[in-house]
Design a protein with these regions (language model features):
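Glycine-rich beta-strand-to-loop/alpha-helix junction loops that act as flexible
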Residues: 57-61
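Structured mid-to-C-terminal alpha-helical surface segments
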Residues: 1-55, 65-295
Length: 295
């Protein structure tokens, strides 16, 4: 149930005023809050329209659910589905067609496009979120099938900003930390025909290492499964020196999420320390982000 006052008078103006106030107080662009709401309310629909355990949040938005105050902001949503990729259009259509009486509605102006990479195939949908019939924001929904998923899913609540504006928080299924790290390791080390431009993968790995305790055994299991199903380069991989072109994007993202390493070279050194026992297959250890060490 949303705050009844949001339904009084001009509901669009009232909701936008509240969201924009929260954005101003947080010192972030209003679009950021609009996206958080649009993605959250879509996921809330999936909780109703799709069977339990048929989907899970992964990627950047999973990290925002874990730590909304300092995760790298993402402008889209990544989902892994339990079924085959051909079931994704119906999953999305059912969510779009679910009415939660929350002022939001969803549609798409174009058919989905294929994604390269996911072992079971992937589709990208363009979602248009509307509030009381007026467009609020657009965002991408990337859906993959058959990605490795080792270990129990986590459950995380909506961003607290939902409550501040007058909406209930939901609890969403989220990729395990170890699986999220394994996918980042795979993305960072993936051989490419051109220069790797994904400085964000390095940023995310440092972010994980500075904030989460994780078992080396869980990381090894998740990584081995990920590399096996992707089958594009062997496990364990090697870490390369970051390209010089990463200096500016790394500096910007470092400021956004609050990382210790000052440069990409410092960051890759930190990641090397974090991953060395994992690459070596050393089980039974636990990472301590405060001590920055395994024990």
């Amino acid at each position: 149930m949303i705050d009844p006052q949001l339904r009084e008078g001009n509901s669009v103006a009232r909701l936008l005023a509240r969201m924009n106030r929260e954005a101003k107080d947080a010192g972030v662009p209003a679009r950021r809050i609009h996206l958080v709401f649009a993605i959250d309310r879509l996921l809330a629909r999936l909780l109703v329209s799709a069977p339990a355990d048929s989907w899970v949040v992964k990627g950047g938005f999973a990290n925002q659910l874990r730590r909304p105050d300092d995760a790298r902001f993402t402008q889209d949503i990544d989902l892994r589905i339990a079924g085959t990729i051909d079931t994704a259009p119906m999953l999305v259509a059912d969510a779009f067609g679910t009415d939660l009486d929350d002022l939001f509605s969803y549609g798409s102006p174009a058919p989905p496009t294929p994604l390269e990479g996911p072992p079971g195939g992937g589709l990208r949908f363009l979602a248009v979120a509307q509030v009381a019939g007026s467009e609020l924001v657009r965002f991408k929904i990337d859906i993959s099938a058959s990605d490795a998923l080792v270990g129990p899913q986590e459950s995380h609540l909506s961003d607290p900003v939902l409550t501040a504006v007058g909406y209930p928080r939901s609890s969403f299924p989220v990729y395990p930390v170890a699986q999220s790290i394994a996918e980042k390791v795979h993305a960072l080390t993936l051989p490419r025909d051109r220069e790797n431009s994904r400085a964000r993968d390095l940023v995310d790995l440092v972010w994980f290492a500075e904030r989460f305790s994780v078992s080396s055994s869980e990381l090894i299991d998740a990584a081995v499964a990920t590399f096996a199903i992707r089958a594009d380069h062997p496990w364990p991989p090697s870490l390369s020196t970051p390209p010089a072109s990463w200096a500016k994007p790394y500096a910007r993202l470092r400021t956004e999420v609050g990382l210790v390493p000052e440069t990409p070279d410092d960051a890759i050194a930190a990641v090397s320390t974090f991953l060395a026992p994992v690459f070596a297959g050393a089980r039974g250890l636990r990472w301590d982000p405060t001590a920055v060490a395994w024990s």
